[in-house]
C-alpha cells in the first residue's frame, strides 16, 4: 500500500483503539484493507476481538471523515417504557382538485368537456350559464343543442349532420388534458350516449390519432333509434404517445346526437381512477384521507362551492362546477379547468377504503372563501347564521350516506351505487381556512346538530390559514373558540421555509394536553432559494429534510398531534398552479418527490406508542445538565416509538447539519440493548440540498434500506453515526 492511499491512525494501545484519530483522508475504498493490514501488524488476540466488535463503527466514522473521540459522541437516552398511543390516523394524505389533480389527473377520463357544458359561469346568485365546445375542435356541420337532453343537469349535446358533399367530413376532435397519454398494447374504453336523428340508423367512426396526426386505431359504432342509449367500443393503442388525441366522425348521411363522449384507459382502477396514481397513494400507507379540499370547499362564492350531493349518483348527470383554481393566479391561468365531479364523494370513500385510510370529508360551513371576499361584504357573500339549515342538512345527510342503513334515503343511494355496506365514517370537517367571529358562530350550530344525531362523530374545526397571521392573534382566537365549542380536532396550516420548520420542531411540546387535538392538515416546506427551472424544482431534498425534522415533533407529541397531511398532493407538470407538491405527473407517468419518501417513511414506521427520547443539555450558567428533547440542537432532531406488534424500537434521526453526528443511545429500562446484528436502517440522503426528482430523472433522491452498518452495542448503549444531511430510520 502506498501512504497516500491510506487513512493514518495513532494506536497508543489496544485500549485506545476506539479513540483513533484521523490524520489524513484519501481513498475510501482502502479502509477495509487497512483493517486487515493492522491485524497482521498487531498480533494481539484482544485487539482482533476488539477490532471485530468495532469494525463497522470505525469504518463508518472513517467513511464520514469524523473522529471517534468521546467528546464528539452525543449522549441520547430513550426510555423504553411505552408512552402515549400513536393514532392510526397519524400520517395521511390530503386531496384537493388543484394542479389538475382530479380532472386531467387522478380521475382517469381522457376527454375534456365530455358533456359539452364548458365554458361554465355560475353567477353569485347561482344562475348557471353553460354549454359550449371548449376543448373541442369541430369540422363540417356540428351543432350544439339542448332540446330533449339525455341528462337534465348536463343538458347540452352535439349533433353531427352530413355536410352534403361526399368529399367533406363532419366530426369533432378532442385533445384531452395537455394531450391524451396512451400506452402501447393497452385497451381504451370508448363510450358515448347517442341517438339517431332520422328514421334510419346513424354511424360514427372513432379514431385514436398520434401526435404526428397519424391514425393509430379506429372503430365504427352504429347508433340506432331515436332514444338515448349508451354505446361502447374498445380501442387498443399500437404504440405509446403522450400527446395523442381522439376524433369522432359521422359516417354516412344520417345525423346523430352525441353526449358524454368518454375515453378511459382499460387499466383504470375500478374503471375510474388512474392506476399508477392510485398505487402511489396506496404505497404511502396513509392513515387518514382528507378530501375534497381545501379552498374549493368554500368556493370563490358560495354558488361555486363544492357540493357533495351533486358529486354522487349517476356520473353522467353530475353537473359541471367551476374550479376556483382556474383563475386564482392570473400568471397560471387555465380557463378550461373545471370540476366534472366524475371523482365525487362516493369515489373518495371507495378510494379511502382501498388504501386503508380513514375518510375525512370536509364540508362548507356557510362561508365563501374569506381570502377572496372582504369581511365588510359578509352579509352579501356568506349565509347568515339563521339560514344555515341547508348546510347543516348537507352534513347530516353526508353521514347518512356514509353510514346509514339501506332503508334510509342516502344509505339507499350508496347501496344503489354499489356499496350496500356502510363506509364507517368516524370524522367530519366543517369549514376550511376560516377565521374571525364569522366562523365559530356558524360552527356552533353544526356541532350541536351533529352531536345530537351522531354523538360519536368527531368534528374537525379550523384555526385559520396561518399560525403567524397578524402576529398569531387570529390563530390564537381560532384555538380559543374551537376549545370553547368542544371541537375534537383543530386543523392547522403552514407553508413556510426551512428556518420556520426548524424553529417549530418543538412547536407542540408546549401545547395543552387538555381540549382538542391537533390536525396538521396542510403543510409543506417552501424553500427560500430560487428553484430549478422545472415544475418539480421546489420539491428539493432540503425541503423534505426539514419536513422530516418537524415531523419528529409530531411524533414526540403523539398525545396531542393525532393527524398530519402534506399539501398539495398531486400536480400535473403542464397544469400546475401551486408548488411544491407531493407527487408530480404527466400524461403517462408519475414521479415521487423526496417529500413523498419522507411521508412514506413515517407512515410505514409509525409504531404503536411514543417513547421519551432526550439528551442531557447543559444550559449556560447551569450547574447540572438537564434532559431535553432533541429538537434541532446542532442540527439534530430525533423521536422514537415502540411497535408492540412487531416488538421493535424505531428511532428516527434527522441530521440537517453539514457534519456527521455520532450518537450513543441508551435504552433506559433495558439491561442489554436489542440485538444490533439484526438492526436495519433506512436512510434518505443527498449531498446536494437542491436535488430533486423529476419525470425524466425519478431516482435522484430515494430511500435506501440496509442492515445497520456501523452500529455497536455495549450493555444497554447503542452507538451509531448519522451522516450529514440525512434522515435515518433505525429499527432495533
Task: Label the model's feature ranges.
Residues 351, 448-449, 455-458, 479-484, ...:
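Catalytic-core region of carbohydrate-active enzymes that cleave or remodel glycosidic bonds
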Amino acid at each position: 500500500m502506498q501512504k497516500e492511499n491510506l487513512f493514518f491512525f495513532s494506536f497508543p494501545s489496544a485500549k485506545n483503539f476506539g479513540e483513533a484519530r484521523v490524520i489524513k483522508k484519501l481513498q475510501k475504498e482502502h479502509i477495509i484493507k487497512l483493517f486487515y493490514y493492522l491485524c497482521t501488524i498487531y498480533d494481539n488476540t484482544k485487539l482482533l476481538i476488539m477490532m471485530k466488535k468495532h469494525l463497522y463503527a470505525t469504518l463508518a466514522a472513517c467513511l464520514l471523515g469524523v473522529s471517534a473521540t468521546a467528546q464528539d459522541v452525543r449522549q441520547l437516552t430513550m426510555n423504553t417504557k411505552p408512552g402515549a398511543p400513536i393514532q392510526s390516523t397519524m400520517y395521511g394524505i390530503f386531496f384537493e382538485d388543484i394542479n389538475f389533480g382530479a380532472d386531467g389527473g387522478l380521475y382517469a377520463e381522457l376527454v375534456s368537456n365530455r358533456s359539452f357544458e364548458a365554458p361554465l359561469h355560475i353567477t353569485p346568485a347561482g344562475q348557471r350559464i353553460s354549454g359550449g365546445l371548449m376543448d373541442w375542435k369541430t369540422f363540417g356541420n356540428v351543432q350544439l343543442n339542448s332540446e330533449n337532453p339525455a341528462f337534465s343537469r348536463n343538458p347540452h349535446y352535439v349533433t353531427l349532420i352530413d355536410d352534403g358533399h361526399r368529399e367533406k367530413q363532419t366530426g369533432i376532435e378532442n385533445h384531452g388534458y395537455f394531450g391524451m397519454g396512451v400506452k402501447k398494447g393497452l385497451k381504451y374504453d370508448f363510450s358515448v350516449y347517442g341517438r339517431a336523428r332520422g328514421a334510419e340508423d346513424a354511424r360514427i367512426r372513432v379514431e385514436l390519432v398520434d401526435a404526428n396526426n397519424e391514425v393509430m386505431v379506429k372503430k365504427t359504432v352504429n347508433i340506432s333509434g331515436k332514444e338515448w342509449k349508451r354505446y361502447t367500443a374498445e380501442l387498443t393503442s399500437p404504440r405509446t404517445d403522450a400527446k395523442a388525441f381522439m376524433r369522432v366522425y359521422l359516417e354516412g348521411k344520417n345525423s346523430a346526437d352525441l353526449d358524454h363522449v368518454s375515453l378511459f384507459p382499460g387499466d383504470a382502477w375500478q374503471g375510474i381512477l388512474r392506476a399508477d396514481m392510485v398505487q402511489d397513494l396506496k404505497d404511502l400507507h396513509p392513515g387518514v384521507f382528507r378530501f375534497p379540499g381545501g379552498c374549493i370547499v368554500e368556493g370563490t362564492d358560495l354558488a361555486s362551492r363544492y357540493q357533495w350531493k351533486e358529486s354522487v349518483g349517476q356520473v353522467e348527470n353530475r353537473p359541471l362546477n367551476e374550479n376556483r383554481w382556474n383563475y386564482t393566479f392570473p400568471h397560471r391561468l387555465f380557463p378550461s379547468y373545471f370540476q366534472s365531479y366524475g371523482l365525487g364523494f362516493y369515489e373518495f370513500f371507495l378510494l379511502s377504503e382501498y388504501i386503508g385510510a380513514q375518510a375525512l370529508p370536509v364540508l362548507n360551513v356557510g362561508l365563501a372563501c374569506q381570502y377572496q371576499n372582504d369581511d365588510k361584504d359578509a352579509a352579501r357573500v356568506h349565509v347568515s347564521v339563521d339560514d344555515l339549515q341547508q348546510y347543516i342538512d348537507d352534513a347530516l345527510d353526508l353521514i347518512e350516506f356514509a353510514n346509514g342503513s339501506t332503508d334510509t334515503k342516502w344509505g339507499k343511494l350508496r347501496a344503489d351505487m354499489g356499496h350496500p355496506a356502510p363506509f364507517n365514517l368516524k370524522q367530519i370537517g366543517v369549514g376550511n381556512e376560516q377565521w374571525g367571529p364569522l366562523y365559530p358562530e356558524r360552527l356552533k350550530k353544526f356541532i350541536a346538530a351533529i352531536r345530537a344525531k351522531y354523538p360519536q362523530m368527531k368534528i374537525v374545526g379550523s384555526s385559520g390559514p396561518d399560525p403567524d397571521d397578524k402576529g398569531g392573534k387570529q390563530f390564537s382566537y381560532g384555538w380559543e373558540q374551537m376549545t370553547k365549542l368542544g371541537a375534537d380536532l383543530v386543523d392547522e396550516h403552514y407553508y413556510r421555509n426551512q428556518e420556520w420548520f426548524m424553529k417549530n420542531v418543538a412547536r407542540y411540546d408546549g401545547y395543552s394536553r387538555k381540549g382538542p387535538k391537533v390536525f396538521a392538515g396542510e403543510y409543506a416546506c417552501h424553500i427560500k432559494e430560487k428553484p430549478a427551472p422545472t415544475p418539480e424544482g421546489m420539491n428539493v431534498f432540503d425541503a423534505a429534510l426539514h419536513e422530516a425534522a418537524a415531523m419528529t415533533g409530531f411524533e414526540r407529541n403523539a398525545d396531542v398531534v393525532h393527524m398530519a397531511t402534506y399539501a398539495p398532493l398531486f400536480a400535473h407538470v403542464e397544469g400546475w398552479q401551486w408548488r411544491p407538491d407531493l407527487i408530480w405527473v404527466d400524461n403517462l407517468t408519475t414521479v415521487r418527490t423526496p417529500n413523498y419518501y419522507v411521508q412514506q417513511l413515517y407512515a410505514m414506521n409509525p409504531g404503536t406508542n411514543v417513547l421519551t427520547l432526550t439528551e442531557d443539555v447543559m444550559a449556560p450558567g447551569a450547574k447540572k445538565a438537564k434532559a431535553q428533547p432533541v429538537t434541532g440542537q446542532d442540527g439534530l432532531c430525533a423521536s422514537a416509538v415502540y411497535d408492540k406488534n412487531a416488538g421493535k424500537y424505531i428511532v428516527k434521526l434527522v441530521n440537517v447539519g453539514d457534519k456527521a453526528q455520532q450518537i450513543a443511545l441508551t435504552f433506559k429500562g433495558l439491561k442489554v440493548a436489542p440485538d444490533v446484528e439484526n438492526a436495519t436502517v433506512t436512510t434518505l440522503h443527498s449531498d446536494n440540498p437542491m436535488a430533486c426528482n423529476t419525470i425524466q430523472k425519478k431516482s435522484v433522491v430515494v430511500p435506501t434500506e440496509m442492515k445497520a452498518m456501523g452500529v455497536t452495542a455495549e450493555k444497554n448503549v447503542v452507538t451509531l453515526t448519522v451522516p450529514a444531511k440525512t434522515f435515518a430510520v433505525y429499527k432495533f
